[in-house]
Amino acid sequence: MRGFKADMTNTQPLKVALPNKGSLAESASQILKEAGYRQRNDVRDLAFIDPDNGVEFYYLRPRDIATYVGSGELAIGITGRDLLEDSNADAGEILGLDFGKSTFRFASIPGRSELSGSRIATAYPTLVRGFLESKKINATIVGLDGAVESAIRLGVADVIADVVSTGGTLKQAGLEVFGDPILTSEAILIERRGSIRDSKIDTLIRRINGVVIARQYVLVDYDVPKSSLEKACELTPGLESPTISPLQKPEWVAVRAMVKRNDVHAVMDQLWEVGARGILVTDIHSCRL
């Protein structure tokens, strides 16, 4: 990868870093597909060119992506917020992508919740060190590469600090989390701090943001009597305002609005109660807002 400094001119392809494997890899490629970018067909490919959009994708270890982007080797990348915070790379977060969510927590045997004077095993030493320093807690960090759940049982640590998604792995190891989360993580889009964005970067950010928003909303259409329109619009205010159209029946109107996906069934029930009929829900694949 030496020599592939991020070129910010439109004559050169935009170089983008993506996870090559792990929990983020498939979702990262999928969101780019939905944003109109071609992706590799073979998971063994380390690079792929999308000539239509002028983008080169490089598939790298998730932990290395912030380093490549922060050094200017690649212009932009997708990684985890936890990995960025632990990297010391000169890269910053652009946009949360609403997948790969987890928390970074301390855990130990049931009943133990003391950090001061403890040996803390973790694969994220920079992140943990920063937290301890911010809280003025004196503890010893035991750096491990990979799974740390066995560190307490094997006697090399008193506490572990690790990414927690469901907590199932910790329970199997006889551990439980304690204290507040050190960090709430998700997949994020990153760039080098202070870099100048060109039109290709702006387009990629805008497209991905459109997919992120579209996944969070649905489009709701319904007919409602004019006498109930105000109540119905209170339930479906949309992002700015709902679209209202006349119908052949003069006492009825048609309404269209974006509604939070997680709220849509409750909203449909409430619309029905105020007299709305013909309530339809449509997925949104992308948007520009």
What residue spans do the PLM features occupy?
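Small-molecule-sensing regulatory modules
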Residues: G3-F4, M8-V55, Y59, T79-T103, ...
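Short, structured active-site "lid" loops
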Residues: G54-E73
